[in-house]
Design a protein with these regions (language model features):
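All-alpha prenyltransferase/terpene-synthase fold signal
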Residues: 1-171
Length: 171
């Protein structure tokens, strides 16, 4: 990563805290934070902060977040929505329109899979991280095809590790 892993997590926590006292109060104590990147290791280092910010937002909506412990579901949903925005901004910073479109596609497809009760959000995340900025997500919306693309781009072992960590977070 361009920044250290600790800096990545600090950046997410500090920005959220500065934005809202509600977000600051939802932060876990430093010693209880789980600083484990899930999908960012599959992609380019320059995307790590944006990916993990968006993924933390996703975990607030659908799983077990690493940095935050909101007091209720409404706060979790609002904080998750908030984190999507700076994550997208961080990805847009390198002037990569395709990368921002990929993130929007990721969020939309994962929400659709969740709403339909269909498995495969981990595969979508893996492909989206591994292929960020390449624009291929528009070509397929099938989790199996996306997972195969992720494995080809990032390697079988790296994708397996990410999917395993994801399953622990979202069940």
């Amino acid at each position: 990563m361009a920044t250290s892993s600790v800096d990545l997590w600090d950046a997410i926590a500090e920005e959220a805290s500065a934005e809202s006292m509600l977000w600051a109060e939802a932060l876990r104590p430093t010693t209880e934070r789980e600083l484990e990147p899930v999908f960012s290791p599959l992609g380019e280092e320059r995307w790590a902060l944006g990916l993990e910010t968006i993924y933390e937002g996703y975990l607030l909506h659908y799983g077990r977040p690493r940095l935050f412990a909101p007091p209720d579901r409404d706060t979790a949903l609002r904080l998750g929505d908030y984190l999507y925005a700076p994550g997208l901004v961080r990805i847009a910073a390198p002037d990569e329109v395709d990368a921002v479109a990929d993130r929007a596609g990721l969020i939309s497809l994962c929400a659709q899979l969740r709403a339909d009760g269909t498995p495969g959000d981990g595969a979508v995340w893996a492909a989206s991280a591994a292929l960020l900025g390449c624009g291929p997500l528009a070509g397929s919306r099938e989790p199996a095809a996306l997972e195969a693309s992720a494995r080809a781009a990032a390697g079988v072992e790296a994708v397996e590790r990410a999917l395993s960590l994801h399953r622990l977070r979202v069940g």
